[in-house]
Amino acid sequence: MSEHRIPVAADKQISPPISAGEQKGCKGLKRTDLMLRFAAFVCCAVTMVVLITDKQTSAIQVPGFNNLTITKTVSFDLAKAFVYLVSAAGIGAGYTLLVLVLSIISAERSKAIAWFIFVFDQLITYVLLAAAAASTEVAYMGAHAPPEASWLKVCSLFGRFCHQLGASLVTSFISTVLFAFSAAISAYYLFSNTNVRPAYSKG
C-alpha cells in the first residue's frame, strides 16, 4: 500500500513575540522619542519666531560730525545666513509636527515610514547644524568685527538685536542636539528589528 505524503508548506519567518520587559522598554523609548521631538519642535519654533521678530532701529552718529546722526534699522534679513536659519528652523518645526502626528495616530510604524523618518532625521539635523554654524560665524563677525574683514561692530550699536540673535542661536543649537538624539532613536527603530516594531508595537 503506497503512502501518501501530505505536502507541508514552507515555514514562514515569524517574529518572536515581544516579552513584557521588551514591551515596557519599547514604551519608554517611544515616550522619550515623543518628548525629544516635542522639545525640538518648541526650540525650532522659538528660533524662528525670535529671529523673525528681531529688529532694532538706532540713531548712529556719523564719525567726524558731532551733531550729525543717521537712523539705521537692522533685522534678521541683514545676512543670508540668518534667513537660512529661519528657513531651516521652519522646516524642522513643520517636519517634527508631522512626525508627532504620525506617531500619535499610528500604533505601528511601517518600514516605509521608518525609512522616511530615519532619512529626514539625518538630513534636518545636518541642515540645522549648518544653518546654526553659519549664523554663529556671521554673528561673531558682527560682534567683534575683525580688522581684516572690514566689518562694522554691529553689536556695539544694536545691542538688543544682538542679544535676541544670540538667544535664537542658543535655541537652534539645542534643537540640533535634540534632532541628533531623535535621529539615533529612529536608526534604532529601523535597524534593530527587520519588522520595525520596537517602539510602535501594539500592546
UniProtKB/Swiss-Prot annotation:
Q: Which residues lie on this side of the membrane: Cytoplasmic?
A: 1-31, 106-111, 186-203
Task: Identify its membrane topology class.
Answer: Multi-pass membrane protein
Q: Which domain of life is it from?
A: Eukaryota
InterPro entries linked to this entry:
CASP/CASPL, CASP_dom
* Residues exposed to the Extracellular side: 53-84, 133-164
Q: Where are the transmembrane segments?
A: 32-52, 85-105, 112-132, 165-185
Spell out the subcellular localization from the entry: Cell membrane
Q: What does the entry list under GO cellular component?
A: plasma membrane
Write out the entry's keywords from A to Z. Answer: Cell membrane, Glycoprotein, Membrane, Transmembrane, Transmembrane helix
Q: Which residues are glycosylated?
A: 67
Among the Pfam families in the record, one is CASP_dom
Q: Does the keyword Transferase apply?
A: no
State the oligomer form and interacting partners: Homodimer and heterodimers.
Q: Which family does it belong to?
A: Belongs to the Casparian strip membrane proteins (CASP) family.
| Name by which UniProt lists this protein | CASP-like protein 2U5
Tell me the classification of the organism that encodes this protein: Eukaryota, Viridiplantae, Streptophyta, Embryophyta, Tracheophyta
